[in-house]
């Protein structure tokens, strides 16, 4: 399954995109970075990814709104979304789950945790489809 999976990473901080991309590419995933939610939605519609790693606080459109739009789209609603954010308040996490996220990782993150969560959700999604 790895190597064939495409992970869309959405974060407005270029350094976060570089770090997450390098981490996931090392494990054989094809990574597609997006600097904004608007660009990420266009990329997802053009070529639906296997999984989305999504920041919350971004200009233009935040990650919660992007997730709501994904879940409202018949063609994209089944894509697993993992939020990855510096917001660590319980209410922020609940809002992310209510928007349609399946998991939530707080920044600063640990590489092994990100890889474990991504791997688990890809396996679950693969078995459900």
Sequence positions of predicted segments:
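The feature encodes the CheY-like receiver
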Residues: 59, 77, 89, 107
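Receiver (REC) domain active-site loop signature in two-component systems and cognate sites
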Residues: 58, 96
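C-terminal output helix
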Residues: 109-122
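Active-site beta3 strand of CheY-like receiver
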Residues: 47-53
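Two-component/phosphorelay signaling modules centered on CheY-like receiver
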Residues: 2-6, 13-32, 38, 42, ...
